[in-house]
Amino acid sequence: MEKKRQYHPKGTRVQNHKYRKHHIWPWIVGLVVLAAVGAAIAYFTSVYFKTKNAVDKTYDPHTAVKTTGEFNGKKRFVVLLMGTDTGALDRTEKRGRTDTMILAVVNPAKKRYTLISIPRDTMAQMIGADSFQTEKINAAYELGGAKMSMDSVSKLINVPIKYYAVVNMGGIMKMIRYVGGINIRPTLSFEYGGYIFKKGKLTHMGGAGALAYSRMRYDDPRGDYGRQERQRQVITTLIKKAISVSSLSNLDSILTSVSSNVRTNLPFSALQQIATNYRGCAKTSTSDYLHGYNAMIDDAAYQVQPTSELQRISNKVRAELGLEKETISNNETYQNKRNIAHGFSFKSGKTQDYHIYDYTGDDDNWWRLFMRRWSVISLVIFWLRWLSEKSFWK
């Protein structure tokens, strides 16, 4: 008898359940991964645009320069950092004088950056003024904004300066607050603004404390030079703390909070490249300052730098930028020469009167002008003699 063929299902109910479960799980995992990736992209996109919007608020298009290829991680650059004590840096606000002026020179070849302080009372020509004008260097920002500040410092020490950032003191406080404060060993003991600082004792400072620490001047035996050193100390410590903070979620909050207190001509793309390509330079730093002497100009107290000191700082910055040394010849070297000729001495140890003489160009301008005119006269005489020897003059 022929046996009937029996139908056997592919598996039991349990087996079928296992089969479906085995094939469904990859889809579930895939969807979860896609959702996670999508959420991450959405999050970082959101943070990116929040950060970009915050940075865009700090951008000053009036002094914009092309930055294509400038920040590739190999090229060196310098930024003029300025600090003011005015309110928020709204575009409609009246500019104040800069209490702090620091050149930040970034050198990827040596994986370091250098901070060089320019004393606020430094005598300098205001480059870009309608007529010849000599003021304290901190007046440049009030008179002609960031461009006059960059041009005046550039001419003072003969280095090219294309970029700047001006920060209100309130902005520094907020930045320090958002990174959780900074730890500093004070360079001297003093009390200021309700805060007590002990020399050499590691002290945790919030925004207000760090600001008080960097502001005090009159109780420092070194005066403004001591204050400049403390300012560089705060900035250096803040930079190191900022790069150690890895939480991207706080970045847009930090930038949003300080956007009304910062102005710069570095666009968002440039800041991105600096943060990415020069991160290794932030771990090592050196510092210096332009040293001057007390002098009275029209009954006002100034700092006047000898030509040798201007040359020293110029050589140092140019070396960090990979540039050849050049002999400084400007208004300040001209004024030094004229004042020394009339009895001024940088070695006197006393506060002396310093006079400003008319200046229209290079150092030794009168001699060069005389030589140029004499050369023209000599050429004319030679030409007339040559013509007189020709037959048609006879």
Write out the residue ranges for each language-model feature.
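Entry/capping segment at the start of metal-dependent catalytic domains
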Residues: 2-112, 300, 305-314
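C-terminal solvent-exposed extensions
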Residues: 57-60, 125-128, 265-370
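Flexible, polar/acidic helix-loop-strand segments at domain edges
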Residues: 70-75, 174-253, 262
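Extracytoplasmic
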Residues: 74-77, 95-101, 110-118, 132, ...
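Second-shell loop/turn segments in exported
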Residues: 88-92, 135-143, 158-163, 218-225, ...
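Extracytoplasmic/secreted envelope proteins and their assembly/folding machinery
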Residues: 98-100, 134, 146-154, 169-173, ...
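Amphipathic, coiled-coil-like alpha-helical scaffolding segments used for oligomerization/assembly
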Residues: 138-197, 264-267
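Tryptophan (W) side chains
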Residues: 366-367, 374, 383-386, 393
